[in-house]
């Protein structure tokens, strides 16, 4: 879909099974989602899974997006997962794999009316490569990740000039380094207290006004560890934010 000015009507859910589950189960679970008034889903893709059986991978993925759209649910596919980031994937030797994967996935889905936007990477900073580094080494590694994100966003845009692009950042504080590469910026929020959660939204509103781009929260709520559903969704409502 073309970028919207406002994503506050998005009511989404992360769907880790996604295109991998049987069609009968998929239709049943999407029906549950619609009964809860949910209208979008975010799914994790895998380049290495694609590489094993490209044709089968693309067939299942396309069928998922079409089935979800028939149920009134748009899809945000995640191309790369930062949680499982392998440092070698940031090097030149991986570029050909990334290029072929992005080309085939984007060409398969770019014409689908149910495609909400491309999420180039989930949580680029949430991995040992970044977390275990300190000081200047951490800055250097983070810039290397950002270089990969910029290249990947550029690859997507060259293949699809219509549909929106985002990056699902771990924290609001990670967003600005690549905000120029996206149409919509997105962040995750698992912070434990209202004050910290509010600060993320205030920072998002300030950045949105400054760069002229909309935003949404593409992951939130984690019972027993962080923000409970009632608190997190209430704050989204107060800040007119889609999730």
Regions found by a protein language model. Give the residues of each.
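Active-site-flanking ligand-binding surface segments in enzyme catalytic domains
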Residues: 201-219
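Substrate-binding surface in catalytic domains of secreted glycosidases
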Residues: 193-203
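Active-site mouth of glycoside hydrolases
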Residues: 1-182, 191-195, 210-211, 220-228, ...
């Amino acid at each position: 879909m073309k970028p919207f000015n406002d994503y506050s009507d998005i009511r989404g859910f992360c769907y880790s099974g996604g295109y991998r589950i049987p069609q009968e189960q998929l239709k049943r679970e999407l029906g549950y989602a619609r009964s809860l008034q949910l209208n979008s889903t975010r799914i994790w893709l895998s380049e290495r899974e694609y590489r094993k059986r490209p044709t089968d991978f693309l067939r299942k993925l396309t069928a998922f997006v079409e089935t979800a759209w028939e149920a009134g649910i748009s899809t945000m596919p995640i191309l790369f997962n930062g949680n499982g980031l392998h440092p070698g994937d940031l090097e030149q030797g991986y570029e050909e794999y990334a290029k072929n994967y992005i080309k085939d996935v984007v060409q398969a889905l770019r014409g689908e009316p149910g495609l909400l936007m491309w999420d180039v990477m989930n949580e680029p900073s949430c991995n040992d490569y970044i977390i275990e580094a300190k000081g200047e080494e951490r800055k250097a590694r983070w810039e290397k990740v950002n270089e990969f994100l910029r290249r990947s966003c550029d690859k997507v845009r060259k293949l699809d000039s219509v549909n929106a692009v985002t990056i699902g950042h771990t924290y609001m504080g990670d967003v600005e380094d690549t905000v120029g590469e996206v149409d919509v910026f997105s962040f995750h929020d698992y912070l434990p207290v209202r004050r910290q959660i509010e600060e993320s939204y205030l920072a998002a509103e300030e950045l949105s006004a400054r760069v002229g781009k909309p935003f949404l929260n593409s992951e939130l709520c984690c019972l027993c560890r962080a923000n409970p559903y009632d608190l997190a969704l209430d704050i989204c409502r107060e800040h007119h934010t889609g999730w």
